[in-house]
Amino acid sequence: MDKKFAILFFCGFLTLSSHAQNFGGGVILGLSTSQVGGDNLAGFHKAGFLIGVFANKSISELLSFQMEMTFIQKGSNNPKMNDADHPNYLKEDISSSYIEIPLLLQYQQSSILKIEGGLLSAYLIDAYYNDLIGKIPIHTVNPFIKYDFGLLLGIDYTFSNKLSLNTRLSNSILPIGAEDYKHPNTYNSSRKGKYNSVLSFALHYNF
């Protein structure tokens, strides 16, 4: 049900952005690299896909507002899970996917470069831990909450009127683990909280 709702919402946003008057818009296609702060692993080792749509509007000669809706894969990856001599031996990593809505203010630094910052909200589609065998089934309480909220900064390099390359760093401002709120902390004994951190690279194509 969550996935069907996300697909319908995504299609609705695309239709709205393509018909809205006085707005620009387009599509987004790229890659995400991510980590989860507080999962006792480190490094942007998790690769995933990023796909979506955007709508934007000029506020002044140098400022514009942009709203996006994207499907993005996040999480963490433990490349040393099977290395018995490494401190990360047998430590679980995380796979997650979200529908994300970034709200951005963009500043036109030059004719080819924009600087951007903003807020994001995200709805969790799926998330789970992985061990050496694969996905760890969730038998009782889901270890992840349904929503993620964060801050982001980025730059947008313009190749042409139609195409630009966006590089962006985002980070959760609230923990994403359910055990950080109300349940025994099964996965994180240090109780540091878990936070998504994402470095993404995406092509933006303007209609």
PLM feature spans:
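Residues that define the transmembrane beta-barrel architecture of outer-membrane proteins
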Residues: 23, 43-49, 95-99, 145-151, ...
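Repeated loop/turn-to-beta-strand initiation elements of outer-membrane beta-barrel proteins
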Residues: 23, 62-65, 113-115, 161-167
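Outer-membrane beta-barrel "beta-signal"
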Residues: 24, 32, 157-163, 193-207
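Flexible, solvent-exposed loop segments that connect beta-strands
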Residues: 37-43, 73-97, 125-146, 176-193
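Membrane-embedded beta-strand positions in outer-membrane beta-barrel channels/transporters
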Residues: 50-54, 64, 100-102, 152, ...
